[in-house]
């Protein structure tokens, strides 16, 4: 499948945060999210840290800072009778359970559907938690695509899909991304790429295990654009890691203030 505004399309630069609707693609219009300018999270699940998402615009790879990468992770479900539709159905229904420990995905009650906004609370070095989110750009029976908001580690999207190759069902995750700002780019150079690869390797391993399969995850990495976009260095203002760190440092003060807020409500 393709995304509505590819990275080489000038429209992606002209309208940051706005996603082309399915009007140009009537055959599968119901599978595409409607046009949005900013994200909104109205009912955050209990336990989810809801910062760095509401009011943020969506960003394609064109709006990112770092080098542009396309990474493809796939695992053959050899020996399984699961069809691509079966794989995607299970992946959507159990998406958070396939992630590595200490990483949390708070999606909608109805699963993964076009236009949904999910909160992410991700583990970071030093026992910090990065709070960010994703937008469900596309979802059908055999694939679904997430797009990232301002402040996320990456500007871009990730597509999860399943297909049949040589009579074997394959599960795949493919990202097209840039680090969103210079701080994230340095982090990727200092081990972030390895951590990202390990994350999706573990996810696909967990998925294949769910189907009773033990196969090696295959990886293909291509640097699509080696240039860094210095005019996007200002993206650091939205850096969700920095904002999450500040939020965590303020936790003791919020706890101390909680009784006083409760008194005012009486």
Regions found by a protein language model. Give the residues of each.
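Hydrophobic ligand-binding cavity/cleft-lining segments
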Residues: 2-125, 240, 244-266
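Short, surface-exposed beta-strand/loop "edge" segments at domain boundaries and coil↔beta transitions
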Residues: 82-83, 127-131, 181-184
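Short, intrinsically disordered, mixed-charge
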Residues: 89, 93-97, 151, 167, ...
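Short hydrophobic/aromatic-rich beta-strand segments that constitute the beta-sheet cores
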Residues: 120, 144-147, 171-173
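Hydrophobic-ligand binding "helix-grip"
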Residues: 125-166
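Beta-strand/loop substructures that line and gate deep hydrophobic ligand-binding cavities in soluble
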Residues: 150-195
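A conserved amphipathic terminal alpha-helix motif
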Residues: 179-180, 186-224
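Short, highly charged C-terminal tails/helix-capping segments
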Residues: 208-247, 257-260
């Amino acid at each position: 499948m393709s995304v509505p505004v590819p990275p080489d399309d000038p429209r992606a630069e002209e309208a940051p945060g706005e996603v082309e609707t399915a009007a140009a693609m009537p055959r599968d219009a119901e599978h595409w999210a409607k046009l949005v300018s900013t994200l909104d999270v109205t009912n955050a699940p209990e336990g989810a840290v809801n910062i760095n998402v509401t009011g943020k615009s969506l960003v394609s790879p064109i709006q990112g800072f770092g080098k542009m990468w396309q990474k493809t992770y796939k695992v053959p479900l050899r020996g399984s009778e699961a069809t691509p539709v079966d794989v995607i159905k299970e992946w959507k229904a159990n998406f958070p359970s396939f992630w590595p420990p200490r990483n949390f995905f708070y999606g909608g009650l109805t699963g993964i559907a076009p236009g949904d906004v999910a909160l992410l609370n991700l583990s970071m070095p030093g026992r910090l938690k990065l709070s960010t989110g994703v937008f469900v750009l596309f979802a059908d029976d055999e694939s679904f695509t997430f797009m990232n908001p301002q402040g996320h580690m990456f500007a871009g999207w990730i597509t999860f899909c399943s297909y049949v190759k040589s009579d074997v069902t394959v599960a795949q995750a493919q990202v097209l991304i840039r680090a969103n700002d210079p701080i994230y780019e340095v982090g990727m150079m200092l081990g972030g790429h390895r951590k990202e690869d390990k994350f999706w390797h573990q996810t696909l391993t967990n998925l294949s295990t769910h189907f009773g399969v033990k196969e090696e995850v295959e990886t293909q990495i291509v640097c699509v654009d080696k240039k860094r976009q210095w005019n996007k260095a200002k993206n650091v203002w939205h850096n969700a890691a920095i904002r999450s760190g500040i939020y965590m440092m303020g936790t003791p003060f919020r706890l101390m203030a909680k009784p006083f807020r409760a008194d005012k409500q009486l």
